[in-house]
Amino acid sequence: MWDKLEKGPIIMIGLADGRSHSEPLTAQLDRDQVDTIWFFIGKDNRLAKGGAAMAQFVSKGQDFFACLSGRVAVDNNPAMIDKLWSKPVEAWFPGGKTDPNLALLRFSIDEAELWEADMSLTGKLKLLFGGKIRADEEGSHAVVSDTLV
């Protein structure tokens, strides 16, 4: 999943409170933390209040899909801000790493449901021209609820 996120890092994420809509944010990845995705947001962003959250991701090639659940919280760890900081992030925060509106949001993933459309050639032809796709011609699916390594 991390390779797919690096190629197209936009994730739809929102609070799982039944009142908020998801919004597109750019994922900041730290491969040392396989159960965490980071986002730079404004302190005035609705996600800054934290809580249970859901995120959805579709890869750039539209062959990989993920639905993630967990919790979001602001975590303005200066070392992590330094590690994840980039020119594209700086474009959103003119005050740099000390911008008064800057917040680093941690999304701690509790569970992930993943689908990969690694369909066989025969399955792709059936999609194109019609026909029933058998189980061995479908992609793969997994539910991951323990991300500890």
Set out the residue ranges of the language-model regions.
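N-terminal leader/targeting segments and the immediate start of mature chains
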Residues: 1-10, 143-149
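C-terminal edge-of-domain segments
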Residues: 98-149
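A short, Trp-centered hydrophobic/proline-enriched beta-strand micro-motif
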Residues: 3-20, 53-57
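Short active-site oxyanion
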Residues: 33-37
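A positional/architectural concept
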Residues: 20-26, 38
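Short His-Asn-centered micro-motif
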Residues: 40-42
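Short, structured beta-strand-loop surface elements
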Residues: 47-111
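Short, surface-exposed beta-strand-loop junctions and turns on beta-sheet-rich folds
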Residues: 45-47, 121-122
